[in-house]
Amino acid sequence: MGYLIEIAFTVLLLTALSDGQLQGSSCTMKNTGRAGVCTPFANCQSAKDASYKGNLPQKCDLIDDDSELVCCVAATCSPLLEGLVNQLPIGSRAADYCIELAQKIHPCQETDSGWTRGNICHNLTPESNIEYKRTPMATMAEAPHYGRFGQGQIGAISWANYPVNLVSDQWVVCSAWAIGSIQVLFVGLGGTFEPKYTPDETYGVTERRIHPLYNGSYSVYYNDIALLRLDRRVTFTTRILPACLHTGTPLPDSGFIQSDSAGLKTTMQRPSQEECSNLFTNHHGHPDGVLNDMEICSLPVNTTGECAGWYQGSPLTLPNSLRVACTHLLVGYKSYYIGSPCAVINTRISKFIPWIEDIVWPVSGGVVV
């Protein structure tokens, strides 16, 4: 009797398997007719590239070892970010997101002439044009992470001068001092500056998280960082892309690009810690002096430039050569400045990576959710 049951079970199993495809079995892509192999999604670059473009990968019928099997064609595009991957800290959720973002910006796609990587990047202004002067950004495409927060109501939004910086598809980072007790209702992304700020997209704000150690009631600027959650996920375009976050690798002494709320940009340099401390001696906002682990001091290369328009939240980024794809690498943003010689104290992003990651890319059951 036991023998008959075993035979019946085997027949049933073979019948079930015949209705699907096992890992390693052949498959055919329905849309292109290309031959593939049933492979776990996590091991299939072509399926990942399809998902980055918003396309559902073609599934094989069976689930093997709890891994979703997809019809996987051979990798046909050159790999991205090989050098960057070696520089990024292992296990950093911010760094992992940066790599994922680059795949979305340059998806592997099939064309009539073969396979190539797409590109939604804007043609960035050569940095040689902004070495010693402040020059305007024609559109937000030159700083696609850049936006502003607003108050009021739809159709009559008042946009503040204080910038915000997009860091994922649903969160922006900004100065805690800037939002203070203001009821921030909207965030604008993309758009143009002239004749007035006009965003491409407007988002509601559903949550605000101010760093627990920020003490704005006493006008002390330490831990000047906040996060705002948007009411829906952002669709990335040429003019709307998150910035990658600087995670703590060594910084150069010059070449930072500072953008301000009027759509102007300039090249900044980093003074010595001693010089920075001397500039902010006895400053009421820094009773313990400039704290190098959480702040970055910067000066414009052209120290005669006007700096009154640099509002809290103005991003401090690294130059094109150190960017991932066409994203900016956000090192910090303006927290405070003194008018002469336009010395700026910037919140240092790398100090707050653990706090940011736990909010923007939380982990549940060992998986980023």
Where are each of the predicted segments found?
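Short, solvent-exposed loop/turn segments that connect beta-strands within catalytic domains
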Residues: 155-158, 195-198, 217-220, 285, ...
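N-terminal activation segment of mature serine protease catalytic domains
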Residues: 106, 110-156
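Classical protein tyrosine phosphatase
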Residues: 2-6, 156-190, 246-259, 324
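C-terminal subregion of chymotrypsin/trypsin-like serine protease catalytic domains
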Residues: 2-4, 21, 32, 41, ...
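Chymotrypsin/trypsin-fold serine protease catalytic domain
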Residues: 225, 230-231, 236-303
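Cleavable N-terminal signal peptides of Sec/SRP-targeted secreted and luminal proteins
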Residues: 3-20, 187
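Conserved H-D interstitial segment of serine endopeptidase catalytic domains
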Residues: 147-152, 172-175, 179-215, 272-281, ...
